[in-house]
Amino acid sequence: MTRMVFCQRLKKEAPGMAFQLVPGELGKRIFDNICQEAWAEWQKKQTMLINEKKLNMMNAEHRALLQTEMEKYLFEDGDVQIEGYVPPSEK
């Protein structure tokens, strides 16, 4: 049986993740409050951020930036802003 959560990002009841993907308190918060669909959306945004801003995950400052953006995206209804990016639907 699938574990259901009320997703804070999508504001609906949806299937939760099978296990905690991020360590620590933030990971617990994500596991308890974010659904699979919202996590998949975040992973796409995360990839864009890493590529467009040329982030190096070995750099602590870059990891901190990515974590801040993740928290804004998942819990504060923020969206990832990438300078010069125009979504395909707006071209």
Swiss-Prot record:
GO biological process per UniProt: cellular response to oxidative stress
Keyword terms, alphabetized: Iron
A Pfam family assignment: Iron_traffic
Gene3D superfamilies found in the cross-reference section: Fe(II) trafficking protein YggX
Domain of life: Bacteria
GO molecular function, one term: iron ion binding
GO cellular component: cytosol
HAMAP family given in the database record: Fe_traffic_YggX (MF_00686)
Family: Belongs to the Fe(2+)-trafficking protein family.
Function: Could be a mediator in iron transactions between iron acquisition and iron-requiring processes, such as synthesis and/or repair of Fe-S clusters in biosynthetic enzymes.
Protein name, UniProt field: Probable Fe(2+)-trafficking protein
Organism: Tolumonas auensis (strain DSM 9187 / NBRC 110442 / TA 4)
